[in-house]
Amino acid sequence: EYKAKIGADFPTDPKEQLMGAIKAVFRSWDNPRANVYRRDNDIPYSWGTAVNVQMMAFGNMGDDCGTGVAFTRDPATGANGLFGEFLTNAQGEDVVAGVRTPMHISEMEQKFPEAFVQFKQVCETLEKHYRDMQDMEFTVEHGKLYMLQTRNGKRTAQAALKIACDLVDEGMRTEEEAVAMIDPR
């Protein structure tokens, strides 16, 4: 399948594989979906894109491993508190694929107590730094927490209003900034 699509054998050299992946990300900046997304979200073409290269963390190496996704607040209601799910002995795609039923993020405290304490601290730090609700992906490998990604989380209109007001009450945003956070679309 790879050869039919690309016209060459899959490279066996890891450096060549990595460079191919990096080039694919940069090429994706010009695909039609990316162009539509930039236009719809007022993102200038000149910003370009970036590639992060990081060591792989494995959540599927036993019962002391796992992976999950979480928000620092409920994206449906805006309620302040961790909201998300995780799976033990799994990789990231397993959480979203629906192959297994994930556990609520609160159950992580029993499965990985030390990693959970650290996770809560990291969540608090990220939200304070970005001054907005965060949507995060993480892996636990043999009890050690690895944060893979964070971004400002998408939310319902109801949640957007509550989060904006709460961030003002918590001293993280001014009233003017909170109003500007609300997407009128």
What are the residue ranges of the model-derived segments?
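Terminal amphipathic helices with adjacent charged low-complexity linkers/tails
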Residues: E1, F86-T88, D132-R185
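Extended, highly charged
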Residues: E1-T77, N89, V99-Q118, E175
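Short loop/turn segments at secondary-structure transitions that flank enzyme active sites
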Residues: G59, G92, G153
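Short acidic, glycine/serine/threonine-rich loops at helix termini
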Residues: D63-G66, D94-R100, Y146-R151, Q158-L161
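Short acidic-glycine loop/turn motifs at beta-strand connectors
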Residues: D74-A79, A90-Q91, V140-K144
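Secondary-structure transition/capping motifs at alpha-helix termini
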Residues: P75-A79, K128-H129, E170-T174
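Phosphate-binding core of ATP-grasp and ATP-grasp-like enzymes
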Residues: N80-E93, V122-Q134
